[in-house]
């Protein structure tokens, strides 16, 4: 697994000669992390990449923000498993990302301590719920896990006969494409059929590095 290099708000402030100290209250509540690669895509304060990764004071406005906007806690039969629809569930396998998107619907969890997923209990629940045929690995970002840990999770799910579809939701191809290594690809290939869902939000993110990762 490649190491992750990040850029701090202080470094961004120095680079763009702007004061960001007022954002410390936001990052204290909702942590900030920006990969060096993704920070390198920023061309000016408040451009489309900046707005996705640099905190804003509006995040602390309780009149327009909800800590759990999708009501996921109520839909978690065991810690870290979200069972909203009858035939599919979301398994939260990491609470870290290469870059913390400011629009994240799980920012209450990402980058914070506590609330860890009980993976054995989650797999037991899935195994005991035969209508579950589609499992989505999410987080955080599953590709932040070391290859061997992700391999073990995928292997455990593959042993459940009624699990037909496994999907991985990841922004790593967008925010840290060097993580997509030949070794990772070989490991993922062992678990086919496997689907990786990612999303690009702006043309500025469509770089040669991201294209190679995809």
Predicted regions and their residues:
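Eukaryotic intrinsically disordered, low-complexity regions
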Residues: 136-138
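N-terminal pre-triad scaffold of radical SAM enzymes
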Residues: 31-32, 77-106
